[in-house]
């Protein structure tokens, strides 16, 4: 039974990483389509770089997101001391997502907000045995807000004159 629980945990972590990496590439592509009046059908291939800048940035953003989830996320997830490390680390990452708005051009609020929310979900799952349920809920809320603000900046960058 323990092996299944560990597998479920890892599945949630990597699902969060995949969703976050996809969003970190998707929303800038939406902004690019709106900026150049391209066809919305181009979103079907949002992972495919459209220019030389994209050839560098798309793989870089994906690799950095996976590395962040792999290092920080796994470290927080594998808390053996029953202190609900995912809740604490998730909240810190969510706050970094809010501050990351200053670095929106590398999708920092989306990446850190996604990691914070993912770790917050794991923290909420552990709250009955390890405590810190409120901190986990805050990680989810702040992480989701940072994620949403990062996405909104990309989608509405032109209207915001960014």
Map each language-model feature to its residues:
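Hydrophobic alpha-helical transmembrane segments
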Residues: 1-6, 35-40, 80-98
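Alpha-helical transmembrane segments
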Residues: 12-24, 91-96, 143-146
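Alpha-helical transmembrane segments and their helix-start/interface "positive-inside/aromatic belt" motifs
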Residues: 3-18, 134-142
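Hydrophobic alpha-helical transmembrane segments of integral membrane proteins
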Residues: 88-119
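Hydrophobic transmembrane helix segments
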Residues: 19-64
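Short juxtamembrane and helix-loop transition motifs at transmembrane-helix boundaries
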Residues: 46-51, 64-80, 99-101, 156
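Juxtamembrane boundary at the C-terminal end of a transmembrane helix
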Residues: 146-162
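Cytoplasmic membrane-interface segments at the C-terminal ends of transmembrane helices
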Residues: 5, 68-86, 118-138
């Amino acid at each position: 039974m323990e092996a299944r629980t560990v597998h479920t945990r890892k599945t949630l972590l990597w699902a969060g990483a995949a969703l976050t990496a996809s969003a970190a590439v998707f929303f800038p592509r939406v902004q690019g389509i709106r900026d150049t009046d391209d066809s919305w059908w181009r979103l079907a291939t949002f992972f495919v770089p459209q220019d030389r800048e994209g050839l560098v940035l798309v793989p870089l953003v994906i690799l950095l997101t996976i590395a962040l989830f792999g290092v920080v996320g796994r470290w927080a997830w594998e808390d053996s001391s029953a202190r609900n490390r995912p809740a604490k680390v998730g909240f810190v990452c969510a706050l970094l997502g809010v501050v990351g708005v200053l670095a929106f051009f590398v999708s920092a609020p989306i990446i850190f907000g996604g990691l914070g929310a993912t770790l917050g979900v794991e923290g909420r799952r552990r709250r009955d045995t390890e405590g810190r349920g409120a901190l986990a809920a805050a990680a989810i809320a702040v992480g989701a807000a940072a994620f949403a603000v990062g996405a909104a900046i990309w989608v509405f960058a032109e209207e915001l004159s960014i």
